[in-house]
């Protein structure tokens, strides 16, 4: 599958549960023309058929190369980012929950569901395949959330793109992230304020911000219906270094705060 088709399929799946993204994209298209996607991100569980290292060959099949690796100690995550030789192709960021670092109760709860994942050859459609297990109960979701918001989100939503990202560098009306976020707020969308609305600085070469996740009603086990966070839209401004080369990587401290965009509390 070529990257163009991959991202087209992803976008259609994404806006099904993130309608705010389509509205925000149209908002900027009206004044800035084509909105360029900087990167997408995914979440998964370690120690399962869907673990990060099993997904990597699929990304490589589209011509991507490994860019870097990351560790998020407090959230018990590890991650890898991937970059394509064609600079017009968005970057990809995949993280996984290191379940072995969770409490025994949380590990058992997750295993109850991830044991339902069918062992089979994976293809790129896995990235919009959602849950490979039954929906948990509301009590299980809520209990897991107390220990890992990331894990609770993943248990309910499954493997779907977590966010797309507007490349502020390619906007024509502004290159200031605060202006972009203000415009998003003026349009009625909430933004992630954890660590401040803007994560990172010009000096660190990467400034990021995001909306708070959309919310949709899901039916949990036992016919219990509850509204939960789905996915969000990110905004990234990349700056050049002293040699004039625009930074293309990711910064752990920024990403750590961006993860909070799906918090239910």
Range-by-range predicted roles:
Residues 56:
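Conserved active-site alpha-helix within GNAT-family acetyltransferase domains
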């Amino acid at each position: 599958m070529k990257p163009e088709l991959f991202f087209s399929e992803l976008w259609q799946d994404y806006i099904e549960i993130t309608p705010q993204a389509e509205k925000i994209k149209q908002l900027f298209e009206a004044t800035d023309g084509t909105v360029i996607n900087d990167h997408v991100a995914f979440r998964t569980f370690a120690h399962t058929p869907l673990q990060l290292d099993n997904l990597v060959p699929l990304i490589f099949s589209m011509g991507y190369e490994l860019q870097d690796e990351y560790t998020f100690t407090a959230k018990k995550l590890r991650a890898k980012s991937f970059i394509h030789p064609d600079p017009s192709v968005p970057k990809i960021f995949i993280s996984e929950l290191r379940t072995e670092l969770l409490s025994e109760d949380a590990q058992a709860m997750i295993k109850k569901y991830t044991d339902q994942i069918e062992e089979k050859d994976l293809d790129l459609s896995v990235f919009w395949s959602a849950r490979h297990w039954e929906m948990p109960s509301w009590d299980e979701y809520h209990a897991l959330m107390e220990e890992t918001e990331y894990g609770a989100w993943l248990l309910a939503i499954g493997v779907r793109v977590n966010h797309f990202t507007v490349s502020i560098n390619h906007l024509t009306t502004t290159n200031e992230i605060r202006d972009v976020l203000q415009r998003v707020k003026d349009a009625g969308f909430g933004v992630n304020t954890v660590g401040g609305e803007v994560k990172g600085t010009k000096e660190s070469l990467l400034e990021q911000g995001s909306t708070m996740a959309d919310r949709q009603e899901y039916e949990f086990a036992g016919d219990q219906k509850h509204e939960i966070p789905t996915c969000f839209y990110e905004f990234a401004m990349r700056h050049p270094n002293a040699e004039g080369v625009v930074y293309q990587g990711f910064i752990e401290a920024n990403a750590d705060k961006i993860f909070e965009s799906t918090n239910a509390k």
